[in-house]
Amino acid sequence: MNKNILRKNRRDNHATKMKTDIVYRLKFGFTRRLNKSLKRGKFVKSKTIPLLDSIGCSFEYFKIYLESKFEDWMSWENYGKYNDELNYGWDIDHIIPSSSALTEDNVIKLNHYTNLQPLCSKVNRDIKKFKNVQYNTKKVYLKRSIIII
C-alpha cells in the first residue's frame, strides 16, 4: 500500500479515536504533556487531569526518580532521541503498558511515577508489541495489578 495512503489512514483513525474514545484521548494527552513538561523543565497545565495528580509527585521529585534509574549512558540530552541503535537515546516506558488501560481510572493509575522508567528507545520500540501480546494473554493479572497500584 502507498505510504501516503497509510499516513492518511493513520491520521484519520487517530482523529476518530480522539473524538470518540476518552481513554485513548487521555493516554495520548498524558504522553504529549509529559514529553512537553520534560523538555520545558516544569509540568504543563492541563484542562483534564493535571500531571501532578496523575504522576503522584512533584516535577522535581519525578526528575530525581527517573535519574535514579538512569543507566550510565543516559542523560537529559539524549531523552527522546532515536536512531535504531542501542544506548543512543531513551524514552519513558510504562512498566505495565498504558495500552492496557480500559477506563479513565486505569489511565491515571498507569501513569503514576512508580509505573514509569527510563528505557533505551530502541528496546522500548522493540518490546512494545511483545508487551501488548503479553497483556492480551494475562488480562486478569493486569486488571488486578491496575487495582493494586
Where are these regions (language model features)?
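Short Cys/His-centered divalent metal-binding micro-motifs
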Residues: Y113-R144
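General structural signal for secondary-structure boundaries
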Residues: S58, F62, D105-N106, C120-S121, ...
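Short microdomains enriched in Cys/His and/or Lys/Arg
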Residues: L66, V140-I149
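Contiguous alpha-helical segments
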Residues: M1-G89
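Short, solvent-exposed loop/turn segments at secondary-structure junctions
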Residues: S37, P97-S98, N124-D126
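Generic low-complexity, intrinsically disordered sequence content enriched
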Residues: R10, D21, C120-V123, I146
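Histidine-centered nuclease catalytic patch
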Residues: S75-P118
